[in-house]
């Protein structure tokens, strides 16, 4: 919810500043250049603010913990069944008469 509010606020600030700078540079290229620079700065500021939220840090920690847990589970599972897979897929030589 808070990230949506920040995004909407950033877009409103961006639109307001674009209107404020319209009178300064009459060329369309200059307007677009200023708009893109301001949009980039606003997006970077918003992302930095969102990254600093405790909820974002908790989400990153949760995902990291779940991924680590999944890797541990997978290694345990493959460790238990590795002997089974090795013996099942052992290559046995075929006699020459059956190979043709």
UniProtKB/Swiss-Prot annotation:
In this chain, the site described as May interact with the LDL receptor is at 41
Q: What are its GO biological-process terms?
A: cholesterol homeostasis; lipid catabolic process; lipid transport; lipoprotein metabolic process; negative regulation of high-density lipoprotein particle clearance; negative regulation of low-density lipoprotein particle clearance; negative regulation of triglyceride catabolic process; negative regulation of very-low-density lipoprotein particle clearance
The UniProt keyword set, sorted, is: Chylomicron, Glycoprotein, Lipid degradation, Lipid metabolism, Lipid transport, Secreted, Sialic acid, Signal, Transport, VLDL
Please state where this protein is localized: Secreted
Q: What PTM annotation applies here?
A: The most abundant glycoforms are characterized by an O-linked disaccharide galactose linked to N-acetylgalactosamine (Gal-GalNAc), further modified with up to 3 sialic acid residues. Less abundant glycoforms are characterized by more complex and fucosylated glycan moieties. O-glycosylated on Thr-94 with a core 1 or possibly core 8 glycan.
> Has the keyword Transport been applied to this entry?
yes
Q: Which Pfam families match?
A: Apo-CIII
Which Gene3D superfamilies does this entry report, sorted A to Z?
Apolipoprotein CIII
Lipoprotein found in the keyword field: no
Q: What are the annotated GO cellular component locations?
A: chylomicron; intermediate-density lipoprotein particle; spherical high-density lipoprotein particle; very-low-density lipoprotein particle
Give the glycosylated residues.
94
Signal sequence segment: 1-20
GO MF annotation, one: lipase inhibitor activity
Its principal location? Answer: secreted
Q: What does this protein do?
A: Component of triglyceride-rich very low density lipoproteins (VLDL) and high density lipoproteins (HDL) in plasma. Plays a multifaceted role in triglyceride homeostasis. Intracellularly, promotes hepatic very low density lipoprotein 1 (VLDL1) assembly and secretion; extracellularly, attenuates hydrolysis and clearance of triglyceride-rich lipoproteins (TRLs). Impairs the lipolysis of TRLs by inhibiting lipoprotein lipase and the hepatic uptake of TRLs by remnant receptors.
**What family does the Swiss-Prot or TrEMBL record give for this protein?**
Belongs to the apolipoprotein C3 family.
Which protein are we looking at?
Answer: Apolipoprotein C-III
Its gene?
APOC3
């Amino acid at each position: 919810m808070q990230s949506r509010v920040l995004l909407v606020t950033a877009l409103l600030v961006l639109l307001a500043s674009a209107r404020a700078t319209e009178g300064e540079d009459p060329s369309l290229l200059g307007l677009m250049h200023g708009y893109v620079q301001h949009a980039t700065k606003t997006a970077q500021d918003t992302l930095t603010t969102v990254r600093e939220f405790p909820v974002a840090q908790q989400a990153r920690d949760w995902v990291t913990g779940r991924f680590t847990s999944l890797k541990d589970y997978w290694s345990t599972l493959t460790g238990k069944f590795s002997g089974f897979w090795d013996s099942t897929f052992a290559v046995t030589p075929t006699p020459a008469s059956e190979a043709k």
